[in-house]
C-alpha cells in the first residue's frame, strides 16, 4: 500500500512504552513513502530518541497533573490551552493527513488540535487500562485501537507494535527444545531498575543454587550494589548489567523472564515466546496487573503482586517449572502474541488518511 506524499504526525512521549511502538509504526509507514513528523516534549526521552531514528520532532510544553499541588491545578487550563494553540500552529504548518496518538501527555493537546483542524485522529492504547488522555481523546477519535482487551469496551484488539529483531527470533520449539543445564533466568527491571527485584533475586539465587544461571539487568546506578548482593549471598557467578542494549539477544538466551509487566515488556515477551514471572508495579489502577493477566490466563506466565512477593514465592515458582513446562508456556506465550501489530496499526492510519 503506497503512502507516497502522505503525511503523518505521531504524538507520543514520556516513556519507552509509548515511544517505541510509535517508532515501529513510523518506520513501517516511512518504508511505504510516508513523511513522518513527531510531536513530543523537550524534557522527556523522545527528544533524544526520535531524531536518532531520522524523524524530525516538534515540541510543546505539557506535563501531567496527577500528584501536583493546587497552584499547578489552577494553572492547568491555561497551560493546556497554550499547548493546544502551539500544537495547532505546528499542525497548520505541517498539514498532516492523519495524526496517530500513542499515549503520553502530549497526545491530549495534540489530539484536540488535530480534531479542531479537521485532521483524523487515530489512537492506540498500549495498556490493559486506558490512560486518562486516551479516555478523553477516544470521544473525538476517528479510530481507537487497544493492545489488550478491556481498555475500551468496543475497540479493536491489535496488540502492541514491537521491535522487528524480537519478532525475528526463532520459535520456542527451535530455540528451547534440547536445552540442558541450569535454567537461564533473565531478570529485567527496566531502565530505572526495579528495587524489589534487585533486593529479592540474589536471595532467590542462593536458594536455587546451581539449578539456575541469572542475567540480571539492574537499572541505572544499581549494578555495583546488586553484584555485591549476589556475592554476599554466595552467588558471585551471576551476570549483572545496568542496561541491556540488545534485548532480542537477551530473550534468545533466556529460558524464563522475571520482570515488571509494562505493556511493551509483556508484548515483547509474548512475541519472543517466553514464559514469565511478572511482578507488576504497584499503581493505584493496577495497570501492570491487567497487562500481564492475558498471559497468565493463557498459561504462559504467573503473576505475583508485590505485597505477596517473597524470596520463597519466587524460588518455589521457578523450581516448580521443569524444562518441559517452560517449553509449553513459551509456546502458549507465542500463540497469545499478535506479531503483525505494527502492520495493523499502520493500516488503520492509512485508512483514516484516505477516508
UniProtKB/Swiss-Prot annotation:
**Pfam families linked to this entry:** Glyco_tran_28_C, Glyco_transf_28
Q: Which organism is it from?
A: Escherichia coli (strain 55989 / EAEC)
Q: What does this protein do?
A: Cell wall formation. Catalyzes the transfer of a GlcNAc subunit on undecaprenyl-pyrophosphoryl-MurNAc-pentapeptide (lipid intermediate I) to form undecaprenyl-pyrophosphoryl-MurNAc-(pentapeptide)GlcNAc (lipid intermediate II).
**Name of this chain's protein:** UDP-N-acetylglucosamine--N-acetylmuramyl-(pentapeptide) pyrophosphoryl-undecaprenol N-acetylglucosamine transferase
Location in the cell: Cell inner membrane
- Keyword entries, A-Z: Cell cycle, Cell division, Cell inner membrane, Cell membrane, Cell shape, Cell wall biogenesis/degradation, Glycosyltransferase, Membrane, Peptidoglycan synthesis, Transferase
**InterPro entries from the xrefs?**
GlcNAc_MurG, Glyco_trans_28_C, GlycoTrans_28_N
Q: Enumerate the residues binding UDP-N-acetyl-alpha-D-glucosamine.
A: 15-17, 127, 163, 191, 244, 263-268, 288
Amino acid at each position: 500500500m503506497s503512502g507516497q506524499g502522505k503525511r503523518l504526525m505521531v504524538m507520543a512521549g514520556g516513556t519507552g512504552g509509548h515511544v517505541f511502538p510509535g517508532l515501529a509504526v513510523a518506520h513501517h509507514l516511512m518504508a511505504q513513502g510516508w513523511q513522518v513528523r513527531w510531536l513530543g516534549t523537550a524534557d522527556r526521552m523522545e527528544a533524544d530518541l526520535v531524531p536518532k531514528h531520522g524523524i524530525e520532532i516538534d515540541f510543546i510544553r505539557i506535563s501531567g497533573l496527577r500528584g501536583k499541588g493546587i497552584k499547578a491545578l489552577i494553572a492547568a487550563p491555561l497551560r493546556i490551552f497554550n499547548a493546544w494553540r502551539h500544537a495547532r500552529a505546528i499542525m497548520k504548518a505541517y498539514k498532516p493527513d492523519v495524526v496517530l496518538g500513542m499515549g503520553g501527555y502530549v497526545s491530549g493537546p495534540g489530539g484536540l488540535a488535530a480534531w479542531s483542524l479537521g485532521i483524523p485522529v487515530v489512537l492506540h492504547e498500549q495498556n490493559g487500562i486506558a490512560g486518562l488522555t486516551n479516555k478523553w481523546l477516544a470521544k473525538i477519535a476517528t479510530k481507537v485501537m487497544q493492545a489488550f482487551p478491556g481498555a475500551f469496551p468496543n475497540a479493536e484488539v491489535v496488540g502492541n507494535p514491537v521491535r522487528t529483531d524480537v519478532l525475528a527470533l526463532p520459535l520456542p520449539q527451535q530455540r528451547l527444545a534440547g536445552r540442558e543445564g541450569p535454567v537461564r533466568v533473565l531478570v529485567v527491571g527496566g531502565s530505572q531498575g526495579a528495587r524489589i527485584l534487585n533486593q529479592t533475586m540474589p536471595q532467590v539465587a542462593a536458594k536455587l543454587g546451581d539449578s539456575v544461571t541469572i542475567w540480571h539487568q539492574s537499572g541505572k546506578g544499581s549494578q555495583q550494589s546488586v553484584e555485591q548482593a549476589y556475592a554476599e549471598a554466595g552467588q558471585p557467578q551471576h551476570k549483572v548489567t545496568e542496561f541491556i542494549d540488545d534485548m532480542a539477544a537477551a530473550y534468545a538466551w533466556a529460558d524464563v523472564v522475571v520482570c515488571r509487566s509494562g505493556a511493551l515488556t509483556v508484548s515483547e515477551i509474548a512475541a519472543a515466546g517466553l514464559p514469565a514471572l511478572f511482578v507488576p508495579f504497584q499503581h493505584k489502577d493496577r495497570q501492570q496487573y491487567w497487562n500481564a493477566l492475558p498471559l497468565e490466563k493463557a498459561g504462559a506466565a504467573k503473576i505475583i503482586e508485590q505485597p505477596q512477593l517473597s524470596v520463597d514465592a519466587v524460588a518455589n515458582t521457578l523450581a516448580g517449572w521443569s524444562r518441559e513446562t517452560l517449553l509449553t508456556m513459551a509456546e502458549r506465550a507465542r500463540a497469545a502474541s499478535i506479531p503483525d501489530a505494527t502492520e495493523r496499526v499502520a493500516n488503520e492510519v492509512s485508512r483514516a488518511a484516505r477516508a
